[in-house]
Every structure is written in structure tokens, then in C-alpha cells.
Design a protein with these regions (language model features):
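Macrodomain-like recognition of ADP-ribose-binding/processing modules
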Residues: 1-135
């Protein structure tokens, strides 16, 4: 499995490149540009615990894949996790798109708000990688 970190801001791509160790460079690649322009099996969504995909990167995904992505995610959250996908959990959602078939929803927050620490991002990343490995 290859992990691609995409950044539309050059400073972010530069920072990632500076902090990826040589060991990680075999499986982690940094790309400057949009993830939607690449041929990848899945994208990761940092949605919230209730699957609302109407802001930030999630809004871009909803625009690209269509509103059915949010609808599928919210249905899966209701049916598989009792109505809330906790930070540290992830779900694999079919996009319905011919090129990018999957979206891994791994919330970084329960409801939309700023993050005070890096822990939610760590937990979401861990959950997304585990979800991808299990697929």
C-alpha cells in the first residue's frame, strides 16, 4: 500500500517532505496538487462523526462524487455504528465513481470545530490506515 499526501499549498508539501523519514519514504509520497487528479483506489475524508460533508475538503468530495457519497456515509454510520462514527474509527464508503472507487471516512472531530491538539488527527490517520489495510 502506498500512502499519498496531497497538498494544494506548496508550504504544506514542503513541510511534509522535510518530516518524512527515510524509512517512511518507501510507502509515503508527497504530491503537490489535488488528490482528485490522481489515479488512486481511495481518498480519505476527515468528516465529522455524523458524516456531514459540507465543508472544506469534504465539500470538494461532495461536489466531485455527488451528494450520494454523504448519503451513503450517513446511512452506514446509522446502520453500523449506532449513529455516530467516533474519532479513531473509520468506514470504507463506495463513491460510485469509475476512477476513485472508495472514500475512507475517518473523522477528526465529533462536530465541526477547530482542533486544539494533534491527537484527533493522529487517531483519524491511524483509523484510515487500518481501514485501508483491512479492505
Amino acid at each position: 500500500m502506498e500512502i499519498i499526501l496531497c497538498a494544494v499549498q506548496p508550504y504544506l508539501a514542503k513541510a511534509w517532505r522535510e518530516h518524512i523519514s527515510e524509512d517512511l519514504s518507501r510507502t509515503v509520497r508527497v504530491v503537490e496538487g489535488s488528490i482528485l487528479s490522481l489515479d488512486v483506489a481511495a481518498v480519505v475524508s476527515p468528516a465529522n462523526s455524523f458524516g456531514f460533508m459540507d465543508g472544506g475538503l469534504d465539500a470538494l468530495y461532495t461536489q466531485y462524487f455527488g451528494p450520494q457519497l454523504q448519503q451513503r456515509l450517513q446511512r452506514m454510520i446509522r446502520e453500523q455504528t449506532g449513529g455516530e462514527l467516533l474519532v479513531g474509527q473509520a468506514l470504507l464508503v463506495e463513491t460510485g465513481h469509475p476512477r476513485i472507487r472508495w472514500c475512507i471516512s475517518a473523522p477528526t472531530m465529533r462536530v465541526p470545530r477547530g482542533l486544539e491538539t494533534a491527537e484527533p488527527a493522529y487517531l483519524a490517520t491511524r483509523a484510515a490506515v487500518r481501514c485501508a489495510l483491512a479492505a
